[in-house]
Amino acid sequence: MSERGNRKTQVGVVVSDKMDKTAVVKVDRLVKHPVYNKYIKRSAKYKAHDMDNAAKIGDRVLIVETRPLSKDKRWKIRQIIESKG
């Protein structure tokens, strides 16, 4: 058996937990402007699989890339880094 390749991981904040077994995670990143050389904050929202419905709004979580689980879900919550509540 061969090992799986390196999977992408990202750290973000849960912005919605209303769906069953799914959380929406907002991931921020800094991008350097090509002309002004100033860093701009860009964000992306990912739907992540949350098997136990453990993540709550405001929690800081680590998400890892996985196989497609539905039309929009390609990430899983690996761990809750910091709990808001």
From Swiss-Prot:
One of its GO terms (biological process) is translation. This is Small ribosomal subunit protein uS17. Belongs to the universal ribosomal protein uS17 family. One of the primary rRNA binding proteins, it binds specifically to the 5'-end of 16S ribosomal RNA. One of its GO terms (molecular function) is structural constituent of ribosome. NCBIfam families: PRK05610.1, uS17_bact. Part of the 30S ribosomal subunit. Pfam families: Ribosomal_S17. PANTHER family: 40S RIBOSOMAL PROTEIN S11 FAMILY MEMBER, SMALL RIBOSOMAL SUBUNIT PROTEIN US17M. PROSITE patterns: RIBOSOMAL_S17 (PS00056). InterPro entries: NA-bd_OB-fold (IPR012340), Ribosomal_uS17 (IPR000266), Ribosomal_uS17_bact/chlr (IPR019984), Ribosomal_uS17_CS (IPR019979). It comes from the Bacteria. The gene is rpsQ. HAMAP family: Ribosomal_uS17_B (MF_01345_B). One of its GO terms (cellular component) is cytosolic small ribosomal subunit. It comes from Citrifermentans bemidjiense (strain ATCC BAA-1014 / DSM 16622 / JCM 12645 / Bem). Keywords: Ribonucleoprotein, Ribosomal protein, RNA-binding, rRNA-binding.
